[in-house]
A protein has these predicted regions:
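Conserved acidic segment of CheY-like receiver
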Residues: 4-15, 20-24, 55
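Acidic, metal-coordinating helix/loop segments flanking the phosphotransfer/catalytic sites
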Residues: 33-54
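Active-site residues of response regulator receiver
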Residues: 58
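Receiver (REC) domain active-site loop signature in two-component systems and cognate sites
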Residues: 61
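C-terminal output helix
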Residues: 105-120, 124, 128
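CheY-like receiver
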Residues: 121-149
Length: 149
């Protein structure tokens, strides 16, 4: 059995955080749920590289928005994929540093789970391809033919 992927989930709305945590855990993910971006930064500072597989956060939060949180997360963990979800969808509020932006209400939970699956797989890197078996004739030693003069 493959180890569970760990998602740092950040939302200042406790109800949204609870629902999102439940959704992810029932799909087999391990969730670290926090209510503030500052808590998330502290978690990121304490975590070893590779221990988190994705950060999923709200765009609009008090003290620090999702863009700033993702920017800091990527400074601390450069390969960490990030998804921002928000109910506000205007050009100025779009996620600048996230790999994926999903508007709340315009995307289904199934779409969010699929995007998470793709991001986590991308973090892991492409599947290692096995080199194709080549059928070459066995090498035959070559002998220099001496010509009699």
């Amino acid at each position: 059995m493959r180890p569970k992927k760990t998602i740092l989930c950040v939302d200042d709305n406790e109800q949204v955080l609870s629902v999102r945590t439940f959704l992810l855990e029932t799909r087999g993910y391990r969730v670290v749920a926090v209510n503030t971006a500052q808590e998330a930064v502290e978690m990121l500072e304490r975590s070893l590289p590779g221990t988190l597989d994705l950060i999923l956060c709200d765009l609009l939060m008090p003290q620090m928005d999702g863009n700033e949180l993702v920017r800091r997360a990527k400074q601390l963990h450069p390969g960490l994929p990030a998804m921002i979800v928000s109910g506000t969808v205007n050009a100025f509020d779009r996620a600048l540093h996230a790999d994926v932006f999903l508007p709340k209400g315009a995307s289904s939970p199934a779409e969010m789970i699929e995007r998470i699956r793709v991001l986590v797989a991308r973090k892991r890197g492409p599947k290692k391809a096995t080199p194709p078996a080549t059928t070459q004739p066995p090498s035959v030693p070559s002998f220099a033919h001496a010509t009699a003069s």
